[in-house]
Amino acid sequence: MRKLSYLLLFLALLPLGTFAQKKSSFEIKNGDFYLNGKATPIYSGEMHYSRIPHQYWRHRFQMMKAMGLNAVATYVFWNWHEQEQGKWDFEGDKDLAEYIKIAGEEGLMVILRPGPYVCAEWEFGGYPWWLQNIEGMEIRRDNEQFLKYTKLYIERLFKEVGHLQCTKGGPIIMIQCENEFGSYVAQRTDISLEQHRAYNAKIKQQLIDAGFDVPMFTSDGSWLFEGGSTPNALPTANGESNIENLKRVVNKYHNNQGPYMVAEFYSGWLSHWAEPSPQTDASSLARQTEEYLKNDVSFNFYMVHGGTNFGFTSGANYDKKRDIQPDLTSYDYNAPISEAGWATAKYDSIRNVMKKYVKDIPAVPSAMPVIEIPSIKLDKVADVLGYSSLIKPILGDNPKTFEELNQGYGYVLYSRHFKHPISGTLAINGLRDYAVIYIDGEK
């Protein structure tokens, strides 16, 4: 009986949060964002869990708080979690729930951007490679097969993070429906606007059916709201520096009222191989930040901290002159927090502006320690092509794609042996990656 009394006393002394998190409310109403009934602007920074080792997540969140921000936004990368069909991975660097929990512990609200298409200069825009092997599949449209798999993805995502919505006591306050869909609508004029809207509505409904119940929003260029906006979701503008134009276009698609938000406030820009790295100055970024603050415009720095495209995750852009523009392994983005996690001149400039509008900004945390790596001497080499004879070939008259070979990432060796001398020009049409060509062993 005494043991039972001790147990009851122990239970009584435990904080309530040990068993149940306190629910909160986040609403979009009367032209404002409201957190627990109080008008609350959003000062957010984009940071992707997949581009930062999990050991550094907390430090980066602390850097954001010390910059004056109150929220973090992140995409969810479907192909980061389901690299093989039906095999899900949410461990280690892929532990999205842990990422969100740590953000909440550090006093940040969380904005979730699950796509399913995310762009983000990420491989296949976040789609798993194996989707292309499914018969009848047409991605990013009102297609039965595609929607079958997006439903499975969204339901699995909810299983991981649904309990972390503010309505359940977590830090997630908003969720984005699709991603910059207006750009896709503008490019795919072969598909009717009605069909585009039907697809967009079904993605939103899948999010609702899965159990996501926090406010929804869309993000597009301000000139693309016609194709990208969807009913009962706040339209936000990407890269819009003209505040009058921002308010005009949001009013048009949101019952003539705000709140007004720039969901992608570009702090820098992406970098392509063999091109100069884009640079923007700190002073102009700080000035635009203050313009938003003075005019009650919420914002999300894209990116506040870019990180790294590990492995084969970096994507590419398309350009008519150069066909393909592959992105770098580095996703530094010339952002306020460098790829290494250090404060930059942009960071300091923005922090000084934010101090005028945000009370009690904490001190900037110390930089993470670095290590010295001694010189590494390589004394052995191996000819990769020399081992090709040990691999059983797949024969055919025409080369197969990676997907047809059931290979999501890495390298494929395509070879052709000619029995007689030939001459002419080698043309490779439709190449979607980097190719290294050898003729008789010569590069």
Where do the PLM segments sit?
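Substrate-binding/catalytic cleft of secreted carbohydrate-active enzymes
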Residues: 112, 116-149, 155-300
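Bacterial Sec-dependent N-terminal signal peptides
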Residues: 1-22
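N-terminal carbohydrate-binding accessory modules
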Residues: 19-71, 101
